Amino acid sequence: MIRVRFAPSPTGHLHVGGLRTALFNWYFAKKNNGKFILRIEDTDMERSKKEYEDAILEEMKWVGLDYDEGVDKPGEYGPYRQSERLDIYKHYIDQLLNEEKAYFSVTKNDEIIFEGNNLLDKYKKNNDYSVVVKFKVNNDQKISFLDDVRGTIQFDTSNINDFVILRSNGIPVYNFTVVIDDYLMKISHVIRGEDHISNTPKQILIYNALSFELPKFAHLPLILGEDKSPLSKRHGEVSITYFREEGYLPKAILNYLSLLGWNANEQIFDYTEKYQEFDLKKVSRNPSIFDYTKLLWTNEVHLRNDPIEEVHKSFTEWAKYTTVKIDNEDSFVKKIIEASRAKVQTLKQLYEFSKNFFVEEFEYEEEFIEKYMKKPWFKQVIEATIRKLSEIDEYNLANVENTLKEIADLNITSRKNVFQTIRGSLLGRLVTPGLYESIIILGKNESIKRLKRALEFSNTLDINPRR
């Protein structure tokens, strides 16, 4: 059985590098009819926070990477939170001590004063001493493993000193816990970032000392910023929370992240179908550059072309994570999305572009007021529009278009002035979705209501007699 895992530490929000790792693990499990496990590695007690754990779980749910087992999906290999597995780790620490493959190291004022397997009572629970457990490294070993991405990797233990596996606070270190967890959870493939290669020899030493069978390893290439240094906040925002709040589509994010290290043979695709083609052999060894512009373009393409039902779902979910309130009928919102999405790149832009559809009252742009509302012909155009729209019996796009052309043909002012006057009166601004579509979306009664409101507002202005 193929079993892979994504094991974030809850010391911050999920970031693009972590999500790429989770995605490739998800791809591999999905393709091979395996299991994808989410494990929380929270043994860094000072930095780990429950709020970050909750955020990671929520962000995984938001992007759509379902896992089979985890802290909120118990399975037979739990617990799935490392802080709940301390007794398990202690058992294996004791085993290594008993077999003299590890030993106690006692320091006082940073000076080693005792090392051995039989810890004297005077060192126990005495704050004057710092007691850790170290793993004993035999310096004449050659460590070699086959990496599914990079081929054979070799290490010489002469470059590895004895290393701590249990801290003085009684909490085991990462390189120890990850071995115990991966073995007991029957992880078959460890797919993780290239930055973990240096940890692998220490982990293999622990595997061998405990007579555990090794999993297969695959180390993914680093993600770099445009200056070719490891991607970090100094290059720009990297948290999934940020991209969610900015209105990026989950499907677009996963589409783009798929391209960072894997040759997918196309630029735009649905990740829920692409897993069938995933192959670790096609994962590059070379680092990938995170290109914010390309991510935005990818999002734009998905926003324009994905099924309206999916975009609508993403739009309403986006609103829940912001202060935006959208409680309109689904059919109404879908019409707005359809009319707007070709002109924006994100859901946030979509809302800003179309937000006056969602409210009954709004402020008019200053440019609209100065260029149109203050003109002497404004009142004539609006009154004619109210009258003509009221006369339409069958309210459809063709009839609305013909009606507006009839108003323009009255020669009250130029055609552009007529259309922009109506547009601004309906939506308060001069750049909106198509005018005919906007009138249909708002409906006859709401359109007339808004035109009357604009007329009332214009009566409070000083008229500019210049044409």
UniProtKB/Swiss-Prot annotation:
Stated family: Belongs to the class-I aminoacyl-tRNA synthetase family. Glutamate--tRNA ligase type 1 subfamily.
One Gene Ontology biological process: glutamyl-tRNA aminoacylation
Chief location category: cytoplasm
Record-listed E.C. numbers: 6.1.1.17
GO CC, alphabetical: cytosol
Subunit and partners: Monomer.
Motif range ('HIGH' region): 8-18
Residue interval(s) of motif 'KMSKS' region: 230-234
Name of the molecule in the record: Glutamate--tRNA ligase 1
InterPro entries xrefs: aa-tRNA-synth_I_cd-bd, aa-tRNA-synth_I_codon-bd_sub2, aa-tRNA-synth_I_CS, aa_tRNA-synth_I_cd-bd_sf, Glu-tRNA-ligase_bac/mito, Glu-tRNA-synth_I_codon-bd_sub1, Glu/Gln-tRNA-synth, Glu/Gln-tRNA-synth_Ib_cat-dom
Native source organism of the sequence: Petrotoga mobilis (strain DSM 10674 / SJ95)
Catalytic activity: tRNA(Glu) + L-glutamate + ATP = L-glutamyl-tRNA(Glu) + AMP + diphosphate
Superkingdom: Bacteria
Keywords: Aminoacyl-tRNA synthetase, ATP-binding, Cytoplasm, Ligase, Nucleotide-binding, Protein biosynthesis
Binding site for ATP: K233
